[in-house]
Amino acid sequence: MAKAVGIDLGTTNSVISVMEGGRPEVIVNAEGGRTTPSVVAYKGDERLVGQIARRQAALNPAATLFEVKRFIGRRWDEVKEEAARSPFKVKEGPGGSVRIEVNGQDLAPEQVSAEVLRKLVSDASAKLGQKITDAVITVPAYFDNSQREATKQAGEIAGLNVLRVINEPTAAALAYGLERKGNETVLVFDLGGGTFDVTILELGDGVFEVKSTAGDTHLGGADFDHRIVDWLAEEFNREHNFDLRKDKQALQRLIEAAEKAKIDLSNASESSISLPFITFDPETRTPMHLERTLSRAKFEELTADLLRRVRKPVEQALADAKLSASDIDEVILVGGSTRIPAVKRIVQDLVGKTPNESVNPDEAVALGAAVQAGIIQGDSALGDIVLVDVTPLTLGVEVKGGMIAPMITRNTTVPAKKTEIYTTAENNQPGVEINVLQGERPMASDNKSLGRFKLEGIPPMRAGQAQIEVTFDIDANGILHVTAKEKTSGKEASIRIENTTTLDKSDVERMVREAEENAAADKLRREKVEKRNNLDSLRVQATQQLEENEGAAQDAKDALKAAADEAEEAVRSEDDARIESAQKRLEEELRTFMTAQQAAGQGQPQGAQAQGTKADDDVIDADFKAAE
């Protein structure tokens, strides 16, 4: 059997590795490097990939593509700002997708990434002496479904059979924990070239269980580079009244110089930036030069807000895992940007311990991917290793009043299964529409709809009598199945929703952030909806009493009917004062009416305690809307 490889398809650099003698090993490329720049250049019919492409970038900026991972699987309206910073032309493609124009040809990001993968696999095949066809490819933990699918398609375009797409922090944890025997709680801090993930895992007895994950999808080493680029350009503009960012060749040279300075500042207190002949004076055509010295202190000042953004995902991951910093046994640094001294200081400050640097931050992810490939191929040297991941956002259904009823909460381990009982909102309601939602906000409209389906053929019965059993089932592949069954009739309907993490990363972060920022407003809205729902339920109960006690005194029926009508109008008005007034009046009239019927022996109180009796303890008091 041909060996399967593990590939870290990075924003800045990529790495390929394979299992050798029970251990993962990095495969060097044709140039002898352990990492390959994720850079592709087009020169006529020739395609250059890796270091050779990077070397000629300044002379060929419009056709040298880098950081393409930031565009893969994303919509145009998500990447406009990043596109504007690129020396090459990024534009809107079919259906709001992203395309890169090179020499009059429109390329999808997947095509460009496939060139990097093809280079990695070709070099590795030559080193191993066998053709490689199977691979595990890693992605950031917060990559959405379209980004994961696009990454997989890039592998397929490169001629690979993609065995699995796994999360980068989980892969890094595999590499770290492969030979460790004890039980540990590990925080993986992954700051790469374009993305930032924090994942907390529990390791022990061959089990790698993800407890929580958080991240910032617009934070990576490239953002630190761009701050240096902007500083250099603004300094030059102040001195010469010329913006270098408008000159593609000059911009490419600035980007390269910024990255080099950032790397220098990881080991030195200052870096000299010298770019002779950076451009020409537009009037005199005399050459212009850029000479600057960037200190580490100035670099940290330029990136202060980026460094602050590093803190929040760490704090969120700890909170979601219900852990304190003292519960973390080890901190693993992944990604080249973790070499920035200020980043290391922040991590140590947040967790209270020195990060474990036994794992190479550039290679750990690829090594872990090779371990996963070995597991899939049944490598006996690995023994029994189990990975347990989580769902990143809450899953639920929309109920009466436009609210979400949570079914499976954020950071629940998968596979997972949950069943709840719901009921109908109206008398003789023939069907219900199930709106499956994902998100952290209490109102359905503020969350992502994953799909809708209808359960029809419910037998005629009073509101609240139907018992609709809704089951959410997420399998190990992340595929969500939702089933709804009316227990009286046995009528059943279902929907399968593939890849439930279909939100783009910015949507995930926005939902969590807005949930925190709008907690007070959400609470008020939720309380308002609950008051309206309570009054409407009481109105339905009053109507049922009138139907079941037709022989009651006319004045008593008229009084209750008037109170019920007022309640209906108050619910429609959504006016808090009217709702409270109508609630008090209807409660009083209903109590008087039912007491009179009991005394007269003309009827039993039907459902007077419907919302608190033991019989209804398993029924959630949040009714569905009627299906259209």
From Swiss-Prot:
The modification Phosphothreonine is found at T195. Belongs to the heat shock protein 70 family. Residues 555-591, 614-628 have a biased composition (Basic and acidic residues). NCBIfam families: PRK00290.1 (NF001413), prok_dnaK (TIGR02350). InterPro entries: ATPase_NBD, Chaperone_DnaK, Heat_shock_70_CS, HSP70_peptide-bd_sf, Hsp_70_fam. Acts as a chaperone. This is Chaperone protein DnaK. The gene is dnaK. It comes from the Bacteria. SUPFAM superfamilies: Actin-like ATPase domain (SSF53067), Heat shock protein 70kD (HSP70), peptide-binding domain (SSF100920). Induction: By stress conditions e.g. heat shock. One of its GO terms (molecular function) is unfolded protein binding. Residues 596-612 have a biased composition (Low complexity). Residues 545-628 are annotated as: Disordered. Keywords: ATP-binding, Chaperone, Nucleotide-binding, Phosphoprotein, Stress response.
